[in-house]
Amino acid sequence: MHSLFTLNLDLERAGKVICAQSLPFDTARETLLLLSPVGTQCCYMKNAALFLISHFNLIILESDTWLAYANEAGVNPEEGVADFIRQFNAALPEPVRVDALVGYCSSAPLALLAANQGACRTLLLLNGAYFLKDDGVIKSQYERDVERMMQSIPQGNCAQVYEAVSLLHTQSTYTPSDYRYQQVRPLRELSAFRQYLTFLNNLASLELVRIAQAVKTPTLVWCGSQDRYTDTASSRYIAQLLPHSELVEDPDGQHHDFVDGHERLYLTMTRFLTRHKQRAIQ
């Protein structure tokens, strides 16, 4: 019976990093590195983890940990992100090696950049939030609202914006033990909100068009037509840029399917990974 346990890693420059890891480790299984979206903790992924650990070795890493290093490394965000994943892979205990990288929502740009650094053999991008600068790409109202909030960092009015949106947190009925509580976690206090928007701005500064075009890794791009948070146009656009991509658009798909236990998505992921594992063996 596989379960999730705490994994402590000591990275050369980033220092101590705390993740979640499924045990016992099975060398016959592929190892997935799952990135939680910006502003969320590992527990946000528990429904997905319950399914995935029955098929794969699993490591869950919080995007905030990664971006905190990239933000303080004294280099541009792209170089900081790339440096972190190199340290992370070097710190993994033998014989653990990342086979597939999973980016969901705002962690998709991180996963994309890591894949460009050769961090995985297969890549899965699920309902990605890419913050594309191309005005020709349709964006949802939610994406436009978030981008306006992101502007409060360079404009210096983050505190005023926080006061306006923090009511969403106070009106939330989710308890901290409920994984859905993570959706409004950045609204608990001003410092968390400022960090959340700073990290999103770092992601928005990445040259994703150039990065996607350079990714050689086979990639599954999954999006849901009923997603009210991220418009499928961004996922379709990224899929067109990737040299080796498979685009799946679920006509009934919702944004939170990955964390809500949507079996159709999990089976699509499993089939994709199994197919490419067989090709690698051949």
Curated annotation (Swiss-Prot):
InterPro entries: AB_hydrolase_1, AB_hydrolase_fold. Its EC number is 2.3.2.28. It catalyses: holo-[CmaD peptidyl-carrier protein] + L-alloisoleucyl-[CmaA peptidyl-carrier protein] = L-alloisoleucyl-[CmaD peptidyl-carrier protein] + holo-[CmaA peptidyl-carrier protein]. It comes from the Bacteria. The keyword Transferase applies. Disulfide bonds: none annotated. In vitro, is able to accept L-Phe as a substrate when presented on CmaD and is able to load this aminoacyl moiety onto heterologous T domains. Thus, CmaE should be useful for shuttling different aminoacyl groups between T domains existing within heterologous nonribosomal peptide-synthetase (NRPS) assembly lines to generate natural product-like derivatives. Belongs to the AB hydrolase superfamily. Involved in the biosynthesis of the phytotoxin coronatine (COR). Catalyzes the transfer of the aminoacyl group covalently attached to the pantetheinyl arm of CmaA to the holo-pantetheinyl arm of CmaD. During the shuttling process, CmaE generates a covalent-aminoacyl-S-Cys enzyme intermediate by the action of its donor substrate L-aminoacyl-S-CmaA and delivers it to the sulfhydryl group attached to the phosphopantetheinyl arm on CmaD. This is L-allo-isoleucyltransferase. It comes from Pseudomonas savastanoi pv. glycinea. The lineage of its organism: Bacteria, Pseudomonadati, Pseudomonadota, Gammaproteobacteria, Pseudomonadales.
